């Protein structure tokens, strides 16, 4: 109730929130209307500004994107993008810094991702939030709150988020490759192989990291150098 009252107060300065009030999602997975769901998500996220604001805006785009599918259920395709748009429109009124807008954009835009507790999935989500450790934890916080605000059947999904976040923490602790900067090869190594200095180096490093992230090559120095040589020959 407290969160819902706060949201109602916020509607005076964030008009897009009014459209969520009483908006039926027409889907058994969602036991609340969009307004009630948003209030539940706000209440079920940790009390720090980034994730609380993200919770407030994360579904603001649902009324804009709503449609009834062939299954006679409600669907909101690409609603996170519409939600980001509403956040950007309100940013000036709310005096969000450019950094806050940037961080909110990423957390809202990708909150519907479904990470699995696998290294491949963790690397993917970490890349989506631009290899920012704080944003990885923030998006996990929002995902948990979002799940709790959807249905009482969300326990399994929350367990997966927790497991993925635990795996991320363990990968950090073990110094595993989570971003291009973590690769056991660098620009100097690639130049020594004959890669031209300049943007080509960054492109090859990105390709090497993609290969590691997709588990196409082991994150080991010699294996990566061999792959870089193949890139140069192709």
What annotation goes with each model-predicted range?
Residues 16, 138-141, 189:
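Residue-level recognition of specific faces of alpha-helices
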Residues 14, 101-109, 201-206:
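Short, well-structured alpha-helical segments
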Residues 1-7:
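Short, small-residue-biased leader/transition segments that mark boundaries at the very start
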Residues 14-40, 61-73:
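Active-site flanking loop/helix segments enriched in acidic
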Residues 30-33, 78-85, 116-117, 178-186, ...:
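Short acidic alpha-helix initiation/capping motifs at coil-to-helix transition points
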Residues 89-93, 150-234:
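Charged substrate- and nucleic-acid-binding regions of tRNA-handling and nucleotidyl-transfer enzymes
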């Amino acid at each position: 109730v407290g969160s819902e009252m706060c949201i109602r107060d916020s509607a005076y300065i964030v008009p897009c929130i009014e459209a969520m009030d009483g908006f039926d999602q027409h889907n058994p997975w969602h036991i609340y209307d969009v307004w009630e769901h948003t209030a539940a998500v706000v209440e079920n996220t940790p009390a720090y500004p980034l994730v609380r604001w993200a919770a407030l805006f994360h579904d603001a785009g649902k009324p804009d994107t709503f449609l009834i599918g062939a299954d006679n259920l409600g669907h909101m395709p690409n609603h996170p993008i519409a939600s980001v748009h509403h956040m950007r429109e309100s940013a000036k009124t709310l005096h969000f810094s450019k950094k806050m807008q940037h961080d909110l954009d990423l957390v809202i835009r990708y909150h519907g991702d479904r990470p699995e507790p696998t290294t491949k999935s963790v690397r993917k989500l970490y890349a989506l939030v631009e290899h920012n450790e704080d944003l990885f934890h923030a998006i996990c916080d929002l995902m948990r709150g979002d799940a709790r605000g959807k249905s009482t059947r969300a326990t399994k999904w929350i367990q997966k988020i927790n497991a993925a976040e635990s795996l991320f923490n363990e990968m950090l602790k073990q110094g595993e490759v989570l971003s291009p900067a973590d690769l056991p090869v660098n620009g100097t190594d690639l130049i020594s192989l004959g890669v031209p200095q300049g943007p080509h180096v960054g492109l090859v490093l990105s390709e090497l990291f993609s290969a590691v992230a997709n588990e196409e090559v082991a994150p080991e120095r010699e294996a990566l150098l061999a792959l870089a040589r193949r890139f140069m020959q192709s």
